[in-house]
Amino acid sequence: MTPEGRVKQKITAWLKAHNIWYFMPRGTTFGRSGIPDYIACLHGRLIGIEAKAGTNKPTALQSLEHSRMRSAGAFVLVINEHNLGELDNILKEVEYGDV
């Protein structure tokens, strides 16, 4: 499994453990490029999660889509093996925060 695949495996396990609805859009010729690896919904809030390994960063197109999603009110996270705790932070913010 690739390093990014391991990050995705951990994200998937976290989403399932918290019973959060999600899907993983597939980048096909009929899909849209730049969309995060995961689209989730928690208490009516849209969450995009981009998985990266190590110090890898989103592409310019991914960053543009992330900005568009944030402008529409979504949460967008870029998660790697070092910041998986951000998932818990977003859960707390959506459940208890001022959103």
Where are these regions (language model features)?
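Catalytic phosphate/metal-binding cores of nucleic-acid and nucleotide-processing enzymes, i.e., regions
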Residues: M1-V99
